[in-house]
């Protein structure tokens, strides 16, 4: 890692490690934007259907309150996957085993998984962007969001399996 003048930025493995972090941060940004869209829709829904309490109506309508909380639950599921993505491990930089394992090959496989993560996160963002405002989440759309989240979780699991060989 260190040469006579400092860190060697030009080695392929160092570039691939940096690219891995950049691509995963892009996927994380996409997931955060999908969750932000859902939080925005929740706020709009609350403003429209859950007015401030009055003497005549001190409690909000339970159906509208449940729908607003449903937006929050879906956004939280997206953020769980985002947390898992941000906390995903990277290959250890073990000098002893560096010659024995194919680090470049491993980093390429991780890079491929990360590209798939970005593509699936984009699909999720497109689904969230297509949600209509001021109505509760349709169960079919929620299933589609959960399907996207399941695919993201599968890709993260595949990424963990690639790294499990190195431990």
Feature-to-residue mapping (PLM):
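Preference for long, well-ordered alpha-helical segments
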Residues: 130-167
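Leu/Val/Ala/Ile-rich N-terminal alpha-helices, chiefly Sec-type signal peptides and the beginnings
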Residues: 1-53
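Charged linear interaction tracts used for macromolecular binding and regulation
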Residues: 37-138
């Amino acid at each position: 890692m260190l040469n006579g003048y400092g860190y060697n930025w030009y080695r392929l493995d160092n570039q691939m490690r940096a690219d891995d972090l950049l691509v995963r941060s892009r996927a994380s940004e996409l997931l955060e934007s999908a969750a932000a869209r859902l939080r925005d829709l929740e706020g709009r829904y609350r403003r429209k259907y859950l007015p401030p309490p009055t003497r005549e109506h001190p409690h909000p309508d339970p159906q509208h309150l449940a729908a607003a909380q449903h937006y929050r639950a879906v956004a939280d599921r997206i953020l769980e996957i985002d947390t898992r993505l941000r906390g995903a491990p990277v290959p250890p930089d073990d000098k002893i085993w560096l010659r024995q394992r194919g680090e470049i090959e491993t980093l390429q496989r991780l890079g491929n998984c990360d590209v798939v993560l970005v593509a699936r996160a984009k699909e999720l963002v497109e689904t969230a962007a297509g949600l209509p405002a001021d109505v509760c989440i349709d169960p079919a759309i929620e299933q589609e969001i959960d399907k996207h989240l399941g695919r993201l979780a599968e890709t993260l699991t595949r990424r963990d399996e690639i790294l499990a060989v190195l431990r």
